């Protein structure tokens, strides 16, 4: 299962390079990004053998509604950015966003369940 998670993630990461972020939302285990071409990507915290970030490309209509998430983050600071690079680590994904720099999506465990973490979780001070 781990190999398929990584293969799907790698394919999704390749396909989002050059796309422009229109909206984004997150909750504890999901980060959903909508692009200006009516596609999106969903990053999930999963635990096939150890916590990792899964990713899949979807149509914008398939993106979850995370507007009322308990642990919501204001992602407006990445709106309008283009994804210049998208790289996978063993348990994380690093996106290089035009004009704001890198965003790392990591995973961890809380009470045996995986969750997502973000660095930075807000824009850097200029």
Predicted regions and their residues:
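Surface-exposed, interaction-prone regions used to assemble/regulate multi-protein complexes
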Residues: 2-126
């Amino acid at each position: 299962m781990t190999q398929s998670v990584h293969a799907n993630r790698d394919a999704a990461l390749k396909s989002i390079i050059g796309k422009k972020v229109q909206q984004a939302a997150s909750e504890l285990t999901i980060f959903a990004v909508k692009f200006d071409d009516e596609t999106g990507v969903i990053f999930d915290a999963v635990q096939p053998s150890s916590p990792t970030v899964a990713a899949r490309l979807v149509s914008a209509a398939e993106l979850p509604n995370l507007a009322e998430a308990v642990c919501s983050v204001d992602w407006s600071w990445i709106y309008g950015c283009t994804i210049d690079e998208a790289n996978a680590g063993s348990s994380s994904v690093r996106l290089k966003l035009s004009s704001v720099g890198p965003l790392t999506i990591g995973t961890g465990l809380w009470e045996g369940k995986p969750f997502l973490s973000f660095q930075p979780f807000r824009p850097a001070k200029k």
